[in-house]
Amino acid sequence: MTGRTGVLLIHGLGGTEYDLGSLHKAIRRAGGDAHIITLPGHGTRPEDLAKVHAEAWLDAVTAQYRALEAEYDTLHVAGMCMGALVALLLCHRVQHAKGRLALLAAPVYIDGWSTPWYRALRYLLYQVPGVTERMRVEEGEPFGIKNPVIRALVKKKFARQDSFHYPWVPLVTIRQVDRMRGWVRAAAPDTRCPTLILHAREDELTSLRSARFLEAAMPDARCIVLDNSYHMICADNDRDAVARHVLEFFGFDPAHAVSPAMARRLARGGGSGEAAPDVPDGTP
């Protein structure tokens, strides 16, 4: 055992570590060890997701968790978007008792304000052989970002085909997420580790219904609602608040949520960063 505190971070669907913004840096500044797993089918090309099942994601994070729990007296888990579903299922599977759990924008329900009315039709398509492998679900505006400056940068990254996030995912992969959403609803009442739920009021992908469900269903959970972000809360306007809440919940000093350079800028009256004059390098 190292005597240090470890944190396992899990990114979202089609994403990378950038889904979590600069949270890993805040954890390290605070004295923790941040470990970011790359889920199977990610970090390469979207086509590689087509043959990956949800079980592979859970097996991968379980293996990582088992390796880390041998190193740390305290081990926390945090997940963003789909990664939050994986994180909850992991903690349920291993009966996580070595630390706490943070669920960031968990999509238990796909019912946000930007989701199309015909979203439920995908369940019919799931029954048609071969269709889900060929159909693509494209990323598009607003990219989970309320801040217009950051959103414009994200749009440029997609246009340049940067590797920070897949531009699309196969519909068959959405089916795997739907499977996990059902598992989460069943597992939540028996996932007993202390849990923090962070969710944006204006999340365009998944409404506050998801957060309220988790808060009510889980035995030891509390929810904090963010008022100035869309879905990608680790990179949007509330990113510093997210880092503060997570650090404090995990027992770290929340003062480390912002970098020393940003802290000096704020001390000089440089503003809160809401207009993103300095976009964090963890922008998704």
Model-derived regions, located:
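The serine-hydrolase catalytic nucleophile loop
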Residues: 14-24
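Conserved alpha/beta-hydrolase
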Residues: 30-46
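Gly/Ala-rich beta-loop-alpha elbow adjacent to hydrolase catalytic centers
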Residues: 79-83, 87
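Flexible "cap/lid" loop of the alpha/beta hydrolase fold
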Residues: 101-128
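Alpha/beta-hydrolase
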Residues: 140-187
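Short beta-strand/loop motif that positions the catalytic acidic residue
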Residues: 191, 197-199, 203
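Conserved alpha/beta-hydrolase "acid-adjacent" motif
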Residues: 204-210
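Catalytic active-site module of serine/aspartate enzymes centered on a nucleophile-bearing elbow/loop
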Residues: 222, 228-284
